[in-house]
Amino acid sequence: MAYRRRKKKVKKCRLCEMKLDYVDYKDTRLLSEFLTDKGKIIPKRLTGTCAKHQRMVKVAIKRARQMGLLPYLKI
Protein backbone atom coordinates (compact mmCIF):
# COMPACT_ATOMS: atom_id res chain seq x y z
CA MET A 1 0.00 0.00 0.00
CA ALA A 2 1.55 3.25 -1.11
CA TYR A 3 1.25 6.35 0.99
CA ARG A 4 0.78 9.72 -0.56
CA ARG A 5 2.82 12.58 0.67
CA ARG A 6 0.94 15.69 1.54
CA LYS A 7 2.07 18.82 -0.16
CA LYS A 8 2.92 21.43 2.40
CA LYS A 9 1.10 24.67 1.94
CA VAL A 10 3.70 27.39 1.57
CA LYS A 11 2.90 30.20 3.95
CA LYS A 12 3.90 33.67 2.87
CA CYS A 13 5.16 36.24 5.30
CA ARG A 14 2.32 38.67 5.95
CA LEU A 15 4.74 41.31 7.16
CA CYS A 16 6.68 41.14 3.88
CA GLU A 17 3.41 41.52 1.97
CA MET A 18 2.56 44.57 4.10
CA LYS A 19 6.09 45.87 3.32
CA LEU A 20 6.90 46.60 6.95
CA ASP A 21 10.48 47.64 7.62
CA TYR A 22 10.03 47.82 11.39
CA VAL A 23 7.68 46.06 13.81
CA ASP A 24 6.64 48.58 16.44
CA TYR A 25 6.33 47.38 20.03
CA LYS A 26 3.39 49.76 20.59
CA ASP A 27 1.28 48.00 17.94
CA THR A 28 -0.28 45.49 20.34
CA ARG A 29 -3.00 44.45 17.90
CA LEU A 30 -0.41 43.16 15.42
CA LEU A 31 1.76 41.59 18.11
CA SER A 32 -1.14 39.76 19.75
CA GLU A 33 -1.63 37.81 16.50
CA PHE A 34 1.77 36.19 17.13
CA LEU A 35 0.87 35.07 20.67
CA THR A 36 -1.03 32.00 21.84
CA ASP A 37 -3.98 32.34 24.19
CA LYS A 38 -1.57 31.67 27.07
CA GLY A 39 0.80 34.43 25.96
CA LYS A 40 3.59 32.39 24.37
CA ILE A 41 5.20 33.46 21.09
CA ILE A 42 4.07 31.31 18.15
CA PRO A 43 7.01 29.83 16.15
CA LYS A 44 7.63 30.90 12.57
CA ARG A 45 6.84 27.49 11.12
CA LEU A 46 3.24 28.02 12.27
CA THR A 47 2.86 31.72 11.50
CA GLY A 48 4.70 31.62 8.17
CA THR A 49 6.81 34.71 8.83
CA CYS A 50 10.31 34.96 7.41
CA ALA A 51 13.32 34.80 9.74
CA LYS A 52 13.95 38.53 9.58
CA HIS A 53 10.43 39.48 10.61
CA GLN A 54 10.19 36.71 13.21
CA ARG A 55 13.23 38.22 14.97
CA MET A 56 11.62 41.67 14.81
CA VAL A 57 8.36 40.30 16.23
CA LYS A 58 10.24 38.54 19.03
CA VAL A 59 12.09 41.69 20.06
CA ALA A 60 8.94 43.83 19.82
CA ILE A 61 6.93 41.40 21.97
CA LYS A 62 9.66 41.32 24.61
CA ARG A 63 9.84 45.12 24.65
CA ALA A 64 6.06 45.42 24.91
CA ARG A 65 6.06 42.97 27.82
CA GLN A 66 8.68 45.01 29.67
CA MET A 67 6.69 48.20 29.10
CA GLY A 68 3.53 46.54 30.38
CA LEU A 69 1.66 46.68 27.07
CA LEU A 70 1.43 42.89 26.73
CA PRO A 71 1.11 40.35 29.54
CA TYR A 72 3.79 37.75 30.21
CA LEU A 73 1.15 35.08 30.87
CA LYS A 74 -2.57 34.91 30.28
CA ILE A 75 -4.34 32.80 32.84
From Swiss-Prot:
GO terms for molecular function: small ribosomal subunit rRNA binding; structural constituent of ribosome. GO terms for biological process: translation. Keywords: Ribonucleoprotein, Ribosomal protein, RNA-binding, rRNA-binding. One of its GO terms (cellular component) is cytosolic small ribosomal subunit. It holds the Pfam family Ribosomal_S18. It comes from the Bacteria. Disulfide bonds: none annotated. PROSITE patterns: RIBOSOMAL_S18 (PS00057). InterPro entries: Ribosomal_bS18, Ribosomal_bS18_CS, Ribosomal_bS18_sf. Part of the 30S ribosomal subunit. Forms a tight heterodimer with protein bS6. Binds as a heterodimer with protein bS6 to the central domain of the 16S rRNA, where it helps stabilize the platform of the 30S subunit. Belongs to the bacterial ribosomal protein bS18 family. This is Small ribosomal subunit protein bS18. It comes from Thermotoga sp. (strain RQ2).
